[in-house]
């Protein structure tokens, strides 16, 4: 009887390690497009700070609007490509992790919100409100931790629980930061200005 239990435990541990490995490989793929949008937001902070120092809020609004536009312009095609080609991409890059296509597809939602959060956080940093993203991330992190415990332990959800909790964390972060950014400046995001 003890041998059967030990064998079952070993099988569960092996499955957990496999799923954890797949998730880590998906996270690596997801972070490639985010590196590009992250660079935009690094440049956004001094650009916004300089406009704020001369009280040129119209320029601040234009720069934030353009940053949202550029992030969406970069991240949405990447997300669409990852959704459409999730399985072939994983088979090509990580053949042992090709069963994680559904994890990659769901993770694209997280990728979109992380990209938008870079812009919102860059705006808040430009206004000198560096504590707001930190507090929002702490709140999102607590929610993520609780959701991880509940969802990952559910055998029907399993490792997808980690992805779902990451989405929840990023959505919470976006809502809180966007609320406080709108308190600093009434955002007028108009993508038409950047297209034509």
Show where each model-derived region lies.
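Helix-loop interface residues and adjacent transmembrane-helix termini in multi-pass membrane transporters
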Residues: 97, 126-127, 153-156
């Amino acid at each position: 009887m003890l041998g059967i239990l030990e064998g079952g435990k070993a099988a569960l541990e092996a499955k957990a390690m496999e799923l954890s490995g797949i998730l880590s490989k998906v996270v690596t793929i997801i972070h490639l497009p985010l590196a590009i949008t992250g660079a935009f937001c690094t440049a956004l902070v001094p650009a916004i700070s300089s406009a704020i120092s001369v009280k040129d809020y119209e320029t601040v609004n234009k720069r934030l609007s353009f940053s949202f536009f550029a992030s969406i312009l970069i991240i949405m095609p990447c997300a669409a490509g990852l959704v459409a080609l999730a399985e072939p991409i994983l088979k090509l890059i990580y053949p042992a992790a090709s069963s994680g296509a559904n994890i990659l597809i769901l993770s694209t939602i997280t990728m979109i919100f992380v990209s938008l959060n870079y812009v919102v956080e860059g705006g808040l940093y430009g206004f000198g409100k560096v504590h707001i993203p930190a507090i929002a991330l702490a709140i999102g992190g607590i929610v993520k931790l609780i959701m991880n415990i509940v969802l990952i332990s559910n055998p029907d959800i399993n490792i997808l629980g980690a992805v779902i909790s990451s989405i929840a964390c990023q959505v919470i972060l976006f809502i809180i930061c966007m609320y406080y950014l709108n308190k600093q400046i009434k955002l007028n995001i108009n993508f038409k200005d950047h297209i034509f």
